Structure formats: structure tokens, C-alpha cells
Amino acid sequence: MTTTLTNLLDLDPAQLIAYCGELGEKPFRAKQLQRWIHQFGASDFDAMTDLAKSLRDKLKTRAMIAAPAVISDHTSSDGTRKWLIDVGQGNAVETVFIPEENRGTLCISTQAGCAVNCRFCSTGKQGFNRNLSVGEIIGQLWMAEFELRRTKGIEPGPKGERQITNVVMMGMGEPLLNYEPTVTALKLMLDDNAYGLSRRRVTLSTSGVVPMIDKLSQDCAVALAVSLHASNDALRDGLVPLNKKYPLQELMAACKRYLEFAPRDFVTFEYCMLDGVNDSDQHARELLTLVRDVPCKFNLIPFNPFPESGLTRSNNPRIKAFAQVLMDGGLVTTIRKTRGDDIDAACGQLAGEVQDRTRVQDRMKKMAEYQEKFGKNFGRIVEIPS
């Protein structure tokens, strides 16, 4: 007999209460269970000692706590850490931890590949395979938090020092094109019985899916970042193809609406600096006009070159001059420090070692090698003896 176990990482707080109700348990059991999973990193029901044995026995036959398997783990010379994560069928995504003084930021993925296909992003050149499940999204945070604690010898649980203080959905994929799993994962990040992160410390980055920006403002408004990268529609149409469907004026209006519900009083506009493409003083002046009615700040991102792009990075003097025009116009502007270049973890390089859809057979062979070395993937249908 083949039975599909329920992966409890897929359930938000309300869903976990409902699931426990189906097992004949009261709501407080769901909160206990949630704390064991998300605060203590437990994956063994027998370790959950304050749960009744009868409940633990039920869970062992009906449920699992299964994050995606880690294929590889690399640490950069600057402390940035990147995990390559197996999401099945020859697909992998990447999760990146960026340590800074008094904070630790985790960059997570929401899709295997990306359909938006921005010209300057290597992930989009790999094609789109599928959306990630809730468990595959929140599982990145679950895995990273407790792996970082284990590395440092920090105990699990709320008394242990939290390693991840900020989460950014800026990895592989467009979060708003995988809406329901993304929002469920966000709710878990914010819940006090799970990770308890402030809405101000969780940022969702989008290329500009206007209707879903409006929906997010009602369902789970977190800090918003927008991948802008151009100062006019003609330029953005070529860099971010989604702009043809949701042009800049519609996007700016959506950003203004979002701020009525957002935890921060500004939108962050991300702008990849491309030599001779979008980096002139005139482009900067156009930006000042474009965003004049949107409270915002700019984050200028030095481009990370890859062979298929045909693009090059703006030099440092040009980036600084561009930033100065924006600052002279009254905009808070930062220049992102590149991190993790030596392990291909920098922004735009999250293409994965096995995610090239143009070489399916090679990819599947490579994944089979990883499976043989690191063990069978988690999160699959499990055979239970009848």
C-alpha cells in the first residue's frame, strides 16, 4: 500500500490547527508541534516529549517533517554560505546566507528556474521548470537556521542565539508567480510560534507582477523590493520582458498602493548597473522623474557578468556618479557590496549546478550521482507496509 505522508513543513499555523483537529487534537497541540518544528528544528516525532505518545504515534504513520536535501554546501572567503538544494527531477535551487555585523540575511528561492527571463540574470537563462512547494520554500529557512546553529554549537530553541535575522525572497524565481506557497511561507516566517520575524525584516522582491502586488498588500504585506533596472518603458521592455504586460506607470501606481499597508514607509528599487545600457546621468534624471510620487530608496547593484548576457558591469566611477545624481535629487541610494563571487553566490548568479534545461539528460545523470553520494531525496511518496 502506498500512502502519501503529509509534510508538516507545508502547513501554515491555521492549516496545522486544522490538521491536528482531523487527528482529534485540540488547537494548543498544533502550537506545540509548530514550536518543535520551527523553533527546535525537530524532524523526529519521538523527540517531541511534551506531546502525548498517542499523538506522536499518529504523526509517525501519517506525517513527516521533510526539508529538501542539501546537495552541496560552500562557504566563501567573505563568509557567505551557499547551499545547493535538490528539489527533485533533476532540479536544484540555491539558498545563500550573508553574514554581517549584528545581522544575518538569508536569500531564498521560490521557483526552480524563472520564467521572467530578465536579460541580465543568469537564472532566467536556465528556463523555468516548476514552482516550489511551501515545504521547499520554508524548508530553506528551516535547514539554514539549524545548520548554522550546529556549525557554531548553538543550541536549538528560542533560548539559542538566532542566526537568521532577515529573509529576502531574492533567489531563483519570481515569488509572485508562485503566490500561494510564497504567502504561506511568509506567514510561517512571521508567526511567533515559528520564526517570529518582524514584517520589516522580511523582504519580497518582484519584477513587477502588478495584480499580485495588490493582492500581497492585503494577504501578507512585508517589505517590498522591486527589480526596476530601467528608467523608461522602451529600455525596460528589453531588460525585463514582464514590463510589456505591466508598464512602469502601472508599476509605480501599484507601489504607491502597497505602501498604504506595508511595514516600511518606502519601496526599495533594485537597479542593476549595466555599462552603456542604463547607467548614464540622463537615465538617473529620468528615474528622479519616474519615482517622484513614490517614497523609495535605490539599491544599485554591480552586474555579475555571465557569458550568455552580452553585457558588462558599469565601472565604479560611473556607478558612483549615477548614485550622486540620485542623491542630489533627494533619494536615499546605496551601492550593493558584492558577496560570494568566488562561489557564484552573488546576485544574478543563482543558476544552479544542475538547472540547465537545455541539457536534460546531463542534468539527470548529474543528479543521480548526487543522490548516490548524498542519499535519497526527502519529500517524496513514502512506502508504508499495509
From Swiss-Prot:
InterPro entries: Aldolase_TIM, Methyltransferase_A, RlmN_N, RNA_MTrfase_RlmN, rRNA_lsu_MTrfase_RlmN/Cfr, rSAM. Its main location: cytoplasm. S-adenosyl-L-methionine binds at residues 173-174, 205, 227-229, 304. One of its GO terms (molecular function) is tRNA (adenine(37)-C2)-methyltransferase activity. It catalyses: adenosine(2503) in 23S rRNA + 2 reduced [2Fe-2S]-[ferredoxin] + 2 S-adenosyl-L-methionine = 2-methyladenosine(2503) in 23S rRNA + 5'-deoxyadenosine + L-methionine + 2 oxidized [2Fe-2S]-[ferredoxin] + S-adenosyl-L-homocysteine; adenosine(37) in tRNA + 2 reduced [2Fe-2S]-[ferredoxin] + 2 S-adenosyl-L-methionine = 2-methyladenosine(37) in tRNA + 5'-deoxyadenosine + L-methionine + 2 oxidized [2Fe-2S]-[ferredoxin] + S-adenosyl-L-homocysteine. The active site is at residues 94, 347. [4Fe-4S] cluster binds at residues 114, 118, 121. Gene3D superfamilies: 1.10.150.530, Aldolase class I (3.20.20.70). Residues 100-341 form the Radical SAM core domain. Its cofactor is [4Fe-4S] cluster. It is found in: Cytoplasm. Keywords: 4Fe-4S, Cytoplasm, Disulfide bond, Iron, Iron-sulfur, Metal-binding, Methyltransferase, rRNA processing, S-adenosyl-L-methionine, Transferase, tRNA processing. Disulfide bonds join 107-347. GO terms for cellular component: cytoplasm. The keyword tRNA processing applies. One of its GO terms (biological process) is tRNA methylation. It comes from the Bacteria. Reaction proceeds by a ping-pong mechanism involving intermediate methylation of a conserved cysteine residue. Belongs to the radical SAM superfamily. RlmN family. This is Dual-specificity RNA methyltransferase RlmN. It comes from Herminiimonas arsenicoxydans. The gene is rlmN.
